[in-house]
Amino acid sequence: LDSLSFMMNSPRPLDFVKQIYPYAILVGRTLPYRFIPNDGTMQQLKNSGALRLIRNPAVVDSISKYDINVRNMLGQYAVEENQIEHYRTAAAKIFDALVFSQMIDENASVVRSPADNSSFQSYTKRELYEWNYRIYGLSGINKANRRDLRLLLKQATGLLEILKKGYHLE
């Protein structure tokens, strides 16, 4: 995102058309992979009341914190989707969708560079400002997601260790 923003805000963004368009397509897409919790066991523990049967407070606390952070992460994905939608609206004022269309194959993969004569739509400084703001928002949520996914992994690893020790598991 930083490189894309740098090129778009350079004195001569047309010099970077071939580099900008592929990035601009990818920014407007949702991630093809995400952390999707398989939380059937967790839901069963909570809904059946079995979570209260666990006597070890460290285990209950760790399970609860992990579950809260999983729900938080799923909420952040919704925020990210919203940010992507706002980006698309701003990008539609700057980029030529026909150029995007020529760059992708039947699987929606970016396979070609834009044509040599490709350009941007005429846009105002205000429209570029809006686009920059949307890039800023996406950058922020991407950083937050990476931070929180690392925390979630650390929590999951810690929870597994607590369970192994507390219940003598291998």
What are these regions (language model features)?
Residues 1-170:
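Long, hydrophobic alpha-helical segments that serve as membrane-spanning/inserting helices
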